[in-house]
Swiss-Prot record:
GO terms for cellular component: extracellular region; fungal-type cell wall. Pfam families: Hydrophobin. It comes from the Eukaryota. This is Class I hydrophobin 18. Self-assembles to form functional amyloid fibrils called rodlets. Self-assembly into fibrillar rodlets occurs spontaneously at hydrophobic:hydrophilic interfaces and the rodlets further associate laterally to form amphipathic monolayers. Aerial growth, conidiation, and dispersal of filamentous fungi in the environment rely upon a capability of their secreting small amphipathic proteins called hydrophobins (HPBs) with low sequence identity. Class I can self-assemble into an outermost layer of rodlet bundles on aerial cell surfaces, conferring cellular hydrophobicity that supports fungal growth, development and dispersal; whereas Class II form highly ordered films at water-air interfaces through intermolecular interactions but contribute nothing to the rodlet structure. It comes from Pleurotus ostreatus (strain PC15) (Oyster mushroom). Glycans are attached at residues 91, 106.
Length: 109
């Protein structure tokens, strides 16, 4: 029973981590396009854990942060893909560990 509850919570967290509306990749004027394995609100438990990894304290917790991100460089070229969540992030200065101020994007638009 406990295992089933834990599994349900994990599934809920995975499906609820990104709720922002995706924008086309061409509309990414805030920063670089990234492919992140996780994208969460900064005020969530997962977001707090990511921020704690690098000792960041944010004054605005109403932003999305990406975890384990890598740049996507050739938008519009065949073969561009992201098997996780494609995002446009304002601050990617943490060597891919986390990215701040992320907005989900749609690579197919």
């Amino acid at each position: 029973m406990f295992t089933e509850q834990v599994l349900n919570v994990i599934i809920l967290l995975q499906t609820a981590t990104v709720t922002a509306t995706a924008i086309p990749a061409s509309g990414c004027n805030a920063g670089d396009v990234q492919c992140c394995k996780s994208v969460q609100k900064a005020d969530s438990a997962g977001g707090a854990a990511l921020l704690g990894l690098v000792g960041i304290v944010l004054s605005n917790l109403d932003v999305f942060i990406g975890g384990d991100c890598s740049p996507i460089t050739a938008i519009g070229v065949g073969g561009t893909s992201c098997s996780s969540q494609a995002v446009c992030c304002e601050n990617n200065s943490f060597n891919g560990l986390i990215a701040l101020g992320c907005v989900p994007i749609n690579l197919s638009l």
